Amino acid sequence: MSKYYENNFEHNLPSEIFKKFIGCVDSEYGYSVALKLTEFKSTDRGFRIAGTDAEARAGKWIAEEMKRIGLKNVTIEEFPVDCWDFREAYVTVLSEENEPAPMFAGSFPGVPEIGDEIITGEVVYVAEGTAAYYENLDLRDKIVLIDTDCYHTYWFDSLFTQAEIRGAKAIIATVTDQGPGTYRDDLITIQNMQTKIDTPAVMMTKHDGEILRNALKEGKKLKVSISMDLNTRKSVAHYVYGMIMGKNPDKYIIASGHYDAYWEGFQDNASSVGSVLTIAKAMIDSGYEPDKTFIFMVNGAEEFGTKNTRYDFCTGANAIIHRHPEWVKNTVLFNNYELSAITDTEHLELNIAPCFVKIIKSLLRIFGYNGDFSYIMPKGVGADDGVFAKQGVPTYMTVCTHFSDVEAMGESLGEYAIENYDHTQFDNKDTYNAEVFDFNNKLNGMINIAVDMMPYIPADYAQEMDMYIDSINTSEMRAFYRKAEELKKIAEEIKEKSTILYNHAIILNQSNVCKHANEYVELMLEINRIVQKEMCRFDPFHQFIYSHV
């Protein structure tokens, strides 16, 4: 694998501002922050879930650390959540011949607690758990065993609903040879439910699931008991932020991560807090005085926070955008961090708002990054940046890991494919890559500073308009929308004018003429809001589509 992240930028920078900044980037400090966060946990195994005491204590520590490094207006704000306070679960095979041996299991945010009850029943194996496997089965008073692969087949909600509507009293999920939880025999992967499920459910390791599966395939009858130390309740979670005030205080650049986690969550997402605070500290230590106000923010409810919804992972970000509409309206760049101290990619990859692709490309050249580079555009909601992007805020994020079958970005994958450790008990400091972490901290910090230094943000909507035009199949649309050709012409005009405005912004930035900069930026953000909120929609399956009417 090539090491694109070995560029330390020290000999390529055009400005003393950037040189001072990277000279003050102390990624060892950021590593210590991430390590410290893993100490805040509900059990010896980890867990900093929204609404738990561990999440609250972590948020307070982060606030104190923000103050210590010199951030201003440090604030903790709370919001309501459905707390999933999981400690442990066990599946025990009940046998007259052998002493029962409890097998440790995980569970799923959003499933109900069972209190002190122990669920006991006969196990029925339903293979992949789709409707065909339930033919002629009576599941009343039974526990089902399901083989899952949520990354490549069906998410848990679809499979668990099949069992629930047929009367299963509990669900045991396990894995086979592909997908999360299969890289090692002793992994337990924790994933959110993304729907309403009223049936208790647990997740077993590949090793333990195989024991049950093989016995059932051999025709043996298995009776098991399920116990679960889980408390679900109404609670409050938190987000924490601090600021470096700008000369233009009502325009914002946000650097964001989240600190809630399954298990220890070193990469996902203690590393993001390390990045956010590393960049904040380096800006302060270097003496950089920003034009716009920088907000350094971390969220305590990104993994889970609301039950019975597809977007249970958006709870914290949703609370932020409703509490702070002024941030949504006036943020010129939202820089999100996920798993920032690991990589499985062959080259630099970024998830970038379409209007910022040209800017980022030009900045990479200016910073002396000459390696391969590719990008994807945020057309769905998978993390906090997606929530802000859908509100019309320009976003970007470094992409460090993939699912093992993702090839669109080119070469990738292997030991650090995301399903091999993410949301498992092996997301710990052993996955840390110091060079990747330092590269991401320096690059993202410099991009944020560079955008801050631009009075006129040179946003370009030409690429978005090209994609919109490509989505207009005029032969099909003409049947129900007689103005399809007119719509196409409007998009082409927007594309042409956008290119002109982009070039004007470049010239104005070079000339240091700032008289109408605020008006220009506000117009740019309003255009982006219209594009993202009116033109970009989701279909019934939560896939991105363009709206044409």
Model-derived segments and spans:
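Noncatalytic luminal/extracellular "stalk/propeptide" segments of secretory-pathway proteins
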Residues: 2-7, 11, 32-35, 39-140
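Charged, amphipathic alpha-helical linkers/stalks
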Residues: 425-513
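Active-site-adjacent substrate-binding region
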Residues: 235, 340-466, 529-533, 537-544
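Soluble metallo-hydrolase cores and metallopeptidase-like ectodomains found primarily
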Residues: 16, 103-136, 190-266, 277-289
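Second-shell loop/turn segments in exported
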Residues: 16-25, 43-53, 113-114, 125, ...
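Acidic/histidine-rich catalytic neighborhood of metal-dependent amide-processing enzymes
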Residues: 151-156, 239, 261-355
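Mature extracellular/periplasmic domains of secretome proteins
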Residues: 137-139, 158-171, 186-192, 316-327, ...
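Extracellular/luminal Protease-associated
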Residues: 50-52, 102-200, 371-374
